[in-house]
Amino acid sequence: MQLDFTITMPGVQEIRNMFDLSQQLNAKLLTKVTFAFDSQQIMSPMCLPKTLLNEIIDENLAYIRPRATPLQQSLIDVLENMKTRTTFWEEYPNAEIGIRSGKTRCERIDAIRGTDIKKILTDKRLLEWWKNI
């Protein structure tokens, strides 16, 4: 069995849970990051400010590294790679405008679906960042 995990912006809250599930099931964890071709792709974790993103990644790596087996190496590799990749703030000259537009689109989709991303963002740091966009 293999687990396929795509890390999204809200999904950074589930990294540890996916790691634990992989270990419980003794399943290989295939990991990737949500693709983004512009700064409006608010579901990409690369929309987060670098300091916040690195803080979350470092917390997860501190938990994962001592416990990992080769089945979870993909997760470690992707997390380490995310720390070296440019965030939207570094890559796009008008990142703030794109991120605001992405937030507006996400909220419109929430209204259609009857969902609320603010209820999904249980990490207080992510919720605070979201509210301040």
Name each region found by the language model.
Residues 1-133:
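Radical SAM enzyme [4Fe-4S]-AdoMet core and its adjacent flexible, acidic
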